[in-house]
Amino acid sequence: MNEKFKSGFVTIIGRPNVGKSTLMNHLIGQKIAITSNKPQTTRNRIQTVYTDMERGQIVFLDTPGIHKAKNKLGEYMVNVAEHTLNEVDVILWLVEPSNFIGAGEQHIIEQLKKVKTPVILVINKVDTVDREKIVEYIDTYRKVYDFAEIIPASALRAKNLDTVIDMIFKYLPYGPQFYDEDTITDQPERAIVAEIIREKALHALDDEIPHGIAVYIDRMKGRKGQNIIDIDATIVCERDSHKGIIIGKGGAMLKKIGSNARYEIERLLDTKVNLKLWVKVKKDWRDSDFLIKNFGYNKDEI
């Protein structure tokens, strides 16, 4: 083992919609986790890898946001986030720039007090506030928890992200190289493709629908002798009325989702894609243990 090589696992936590997936995507330098302006976009732990052969390797776990669960899927998401705190070497807690520490933040603080893992607080979106305010926010958070570091940053603008990486390496132990240098994620291509389709649906649909949708890949196969991949995917919703909205007038909404998804999938896979989408109704699937597992959210892992 290289005695100068550091390695370990880092989880990114925070309330829903605070910018966790955006931060991870920018740290890695490639889009892996889906992003949206709607809360609870991330449903699984997404494992991505940052490698600097001179310093070490960081394995990031982007977890679902910690929030009050409203159904079994919500309970699963919160359990994933909280369970991860016990598994990692460093915790990144992402917050928005504010003096207000609400019930959600207090809940996270209580969870952090149960572990001995070093916690780096990242105050995100500092590009949206005055500089003098940032000092106030840092002082506010210093009073509620003994953070290893507090870093003002902007995930979207990639501001201070080098400092975030430096501070992570500061607290990582010396250890082995877990993944090859070129590896950036342990997510299979089918899972990433499904998440891209779900992201485009999140962006296109009204607030009442997105949390009730899942996407699974029915078929994904390259054509022999051709630079093209055929992908058949199904968008699952909970209500017949939602199905109509997802399809849209004359199929316009489904076509829009498919077109936007296809463009990004082609960039990801570096090949032409023939994408076909279907919509099915599975009533109240978020309260069905069987369907939650069937759509790729595995409770047995936590």
Predicted features, each with a name:
Residues 62, 124, 154:
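Active-site glycine-centered loops adjacent to acidic/histidine catalytic or metal-binding residues
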Residues 1-79, 83-86:
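Conserved G1/Walker A P-loop phosphate-binding module
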Residues 19, 160, 253:
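Conserved glycine(s) of the Walker
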Residues 189-302:
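P-loop NTP-binding site
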